[in-house]
Amino acid sequence: MEELDCEPAVTWIPGVNSKKKQMCFDWGPGEMLLCETSFNKTDKSEKVPSCPFIYIIRKDVDVYSQILRKLFNESHGIFVGLQRLEEELSGKSRKAQLVRVSKNYRSVIRACMEEMHQVAIAAKDPASGRQFSSQVSILSAMELIWNLCEILFIEVAPAGPLLLHLLDWVRLHVCEVDSLSADVLGSDHPSKHESFWNLVTVLVLQGRLDEARQMLSKEADASPSSAGMCRVLGDLMRTMPILSPGNTQTLTELELKWQHWREECERHLQDNTFAANPHLESLCKIMLGDEATLLEQKELMSNWYHFLVTRLLYSNPTVKPTDLHLYAQSSLDMFLGGESSPEPLDNILMAAFEFDIHQVIKECSIALSNWWFVAHLTDLLDHCRLLQSHNLYFGSNMREFLLLEYASGLFAHHSLWQLGVDYFDYCPELGRVSLELHIERIPLNTEQKALKVLRICEQRQMTEQVGSICKILAMKAVRNNRLGSALSWSIRAKDAAFATLVSDRFLRDYCERGCFSDLDLIDNLGPAMMLSDRLTFLGKYREFHRLYGEKRFGDAASLLLSLMTSQIAPRSFWMTLLTDALPLLEQKQVIFSAEQTYELMRCLEDLASRRPECGEPDAQRLQDDDIETTKVEMLRLALARNLARAIIREGSLEGS
């Protein structure tokens, strides 16, 4: 099934006047940057001499709420657990497991709502208090909707148990009766309390007949004239047939018993048993499901779905799921009475009673301020195999689309982005691509955060992103003159060009300071040394110094010569290498053979005689600078002396 959305509603941004100024904008992962240009909209060539304003518009502001972040964190664990549980779900246990997951989600919502309620009470700023109270109302509505969806779509309660679930639903979400009960029972004479009959009526409206009977017994004790009527009505409440969870009676048996009980209630009403007490008579009419009497108690029920469940309890307790929408629509119409229009919450609940899952999700997406609710509910319903046929026109299904939107919002937050990674992982169609796009936009403020991002990319074989992140960190390290860190990141990125650049910086620093920094890193390059010629040279040149320091002069001389003759050393560094050869040439023992000395002499003359090319001031300075000339002369003298010594030594060895 494909679905095309209608035109989105226009959102007005305070302070932005697009009629006077031309606007430009840029989308980010979780927000939009909007700014006024310097051009007048009516005449683009005329510049407006005023300072433009910049606006940052966030679409998912809820991620910045400290309390809601707990909701996101807790539900993330439930979500991941559900995805991993999918392979184990089968048979009868599947439904029980899914119901358990749904209740876990609801418990997280309720815990968050209760904490938000406490914060709202403690708020000193009236504006903050109103904001928190508004958020409490939203969370309450979310739990209300989720609970109903759990009953209808996940529990799939049949006729009979369906009403029991709906009664629990109403009792859970219409809880003013508890505070009312505490007030009445806490008084010296409960039956004389001004809210006594309101309390009894609400208890009957919610089907809490045992509690209602206890209240009537207090009235009977306090008013002997009403004792008989209270006893009769209490007996009717006690004998009302209700299908309890452990009861084995069939629906047919229940309907027969209920019909007999109803006839007895009608008989007492016709006999004017309660005529002397209007309150008791009203209660009897409620138990008969009299709609006019029920509507008189609108204020006590406060909403139409309470009216619906009470109406079903006393008129059709074995209602079938397929008939729910008829009762729901008529209850809504009767309760509103044409005086007001349905609210968004009413439309969502009505869609649920009509078993229109897609409409529920669509209405929730419009009404709620973030994607958390619809993303997790849709995912759960998808695991119930209720959404397989619903594909969107741009190549994804509804579950994946909503999860992608939710995860994108998480990436706008400095720490919640880590949760978003798992949501992308469980989107088989577009999750990988979306993760790649979003992870590149994470600001790498600290090395610790960068390592987290890098680990995530490496675990998912995101080679391109790994390279990109390593290059960014290498550049930052170079700018901060942390050459060891820069070299480490360039090696990790397998970036030969950048490794060459950093190696050059190491060599330049050596020329200026006469020693290497980050020796541990250079000494342990290992196979990474082969990433670039310059890095290889750096590693080998450091090895030359180590051999020299260990007085392994023969090995050091061979390595130095190989660095020059193999052309791996940059020509600009040849003079440094030849200068490093001087101490070896001056040793008492002959280190360089005649052949090796000839090679060094060739390199020196090649360096001294090569004509500098245009734009190479370093080579020009080689001939012009007196210091360099002195070095060349010293090297020639040392090489000549070493050659003579080597020839004599080699001749002596041959003669012997």
UniProtKB/Swiss-Prot annotation:
Essential component of the nuclear pore complex (NPC) that seems to be required for NPC assembly and maintenance. As part of the NPC Nup107-160 subcomplex plays a role in RNA export and in tethering NUP96/Nup98 and NUP153 to the nucleus. The Nup107-160 complex seems to be required for spindle assembly during mitosis. NUP85 is required for membrane clustering of CCL2-activated CCR2. Seems to be involved in CCR2-mediated chemotaxis of monocytes and may link activated CCR2 to the phosphatidyl-inositol 3-kinase-Rac-lammellipodium protrusion cascade. Involved in nephrogenesis. GO terms for cellular component: cytoplasm; kinetochore; nuclear envelope; nuclear membrane; nuclear pore outer ring; spindle. It comes from Rattus norvegicus. It comes from the Eukaryota. It is found in: Nucleus, Nuclear pore complex; Chromosome, Centromere, Kinetochore; Cytoplasm, Cytoskeleton, Spindle; Cytoplasm. GO terms for molecular function: structural constituent of nuclear pore. Keywords: Acetylation, Centromere, Chromosome, Cytoplasm, Cytoskeleton, Kinetochore, Membrane, mRNA transport, Nuclear pore complex, Nucleus, Phosphoprotein, Protein transport, Translocation, Transport. Belongs to the nucleoporin Nup85 family. The gene is Nup85. The modification Phosphoserine is found at S223. The modification N-acetylmethionine is found at M1. The modification N6-acetyllysine is found at K92. This is Nuclear pore complex protein Nup85. The keyword Translocase does not apply.
